[in-house]
Amino acid sequence: MILANEVCDALATKLFKKIDNKIFELGVDLNLSLVPLSPDPELLKIIKNIESRLGPLPNHYQSEICLVLKPWLTYLNNFLDQGCILLIDYGYTEKDYYAPQRSSGTLLSYEQHKAYDNPFINIGQRDITAHVNFSHLAEIGVDLGLDLLGYCSQMMFLAACKIDQLEKTYPGK
């Protein structure tokens, strides 16, 4: 068994933005400002697939895609002759991840359990995270020949494991 708790959301992501109905990758300049760049071909391919399933993303829509999920999951899969990979993380299905109201993406930074939307403050002192597109992760696993047993959000997983009963079972601990 391979268990990864809150690993996927910490993997590097590519930011993108739709400007004048064109997709741009967002980079960072020396002034710590986001600047539009020509998109990575793999990024563009994934976005086109998302738009073919969900419809066009609105103009000025910004989000992120984790291109390293596939090589990372491939690496994990290569360790298994048999067994399972259990990934626990924060995220959404593709439909919810790229919903029109989530037009600024999910990229956040955390410091002392507080969330911030600007990752350029206290660089090196904050954890940077982006939620996981569970649909994309599941698709990668199936493409690798893994059997998908199911997926749910971390909140639903913990609720199903009766996390709320821990305090009652072990008061004061």
Regions found by a protein language model. Name each.
Residues 48-173:
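Long, Lys/Arg- and hydrophobic-enriched amphipathic alpha-helices
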Residues 3-48, 100-110:
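A mobile, often basic/glycine-rich helix-loop segment
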